[in-house]
Amino acid sequence: MANRIKKGDQVVINTGKDKGKQGEVVRVEGDRVIVSNANVIKRHTKPNPQAGVAGGVVEREASIHISNVNIVNPATGKGERVGFKVLEDGRKLRVFRSSGEALDA
């Protein structure tokens, strides 16, 4: 099954502590996505001079399950569900389910 959400998509978070936040998808890892400036966690790291890493508390984005985000429709500004439409030449095209307009050109 092809992913409905890809890197670079603008998404809105549906559930959790960051509900309602919008951001860009930085990375897709299977059924999880990493959204910029959302689900930020703190990790305590040890210094590693060989790798050039200074120790301390580092903030970074944690992954969110793909079912907890929706793609933002530029026309409405709201998060909407996405489906697929198969073209005559066999290509799959992502479309918004509410309006049927194409997400990819």
Curated annotation (Swiss-Prot):
Keywords: Ribonucleoprotein, Ribosomal protein, RNA-binding, rRNA-binding. One of its GO terms (molecular function) is structural constituent of ribosome. InterPro entries: KOW, Rib_uL2_dom2, Ribosomal_uL24, Ribosomal_uL24_KOW, Translation_prot_SH3-like_sf. One of its GO terms (cellular component) is ribosome. One of its GO terms (biological process) is translation. Belongs to the universal ribosomal protein uL24 family. One of two assembly initiator proteins, it binds directly to the 5'-end of the 23S rRNA, where it nucleates assembly of the 50S subunit. Part of the 50S ribosomal subunit. This is Large ribosomal subunit protein uL24. The gene is rplX.
